[in-house]
Amino acid sequence: LALQPIDQDTIAIAHRLTAVPHFNWPTGMDLTPDGLSAVVLTYNNGYLFKRRQNEDWPNAFKRKPQRLRFDRLFQQEAVSFGFYGKSVFVTSERIPAPLVRIDLEESDKKP
């Protein structure tokens, strides 16, 4: 869909661009403020995709992502990057719904 505002009388039509082969049942997704990284959340894990220079999203989503584990949560439902795109916030649908922060720079250092 277009990222710029459209006239309210205009019908926006979404088109499937590609299938993402790495997981099933996505529950949330967010893009970094610079538009170069995406995080996709499932009930069990998060997946971080980083675009290469001049790469489109369909091709970026075909590459193997970095897996992010959120062991303390059950049925993760919502995900968001922090303001600068250096951390990810995740919460679950179970009450009480804790908010977990993952520092992406630290997760890059883990084996």
Task: Explain the meaning of each model-derived region.
Residues 1-111:
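Sequence/structural signature of beta-propeller domains
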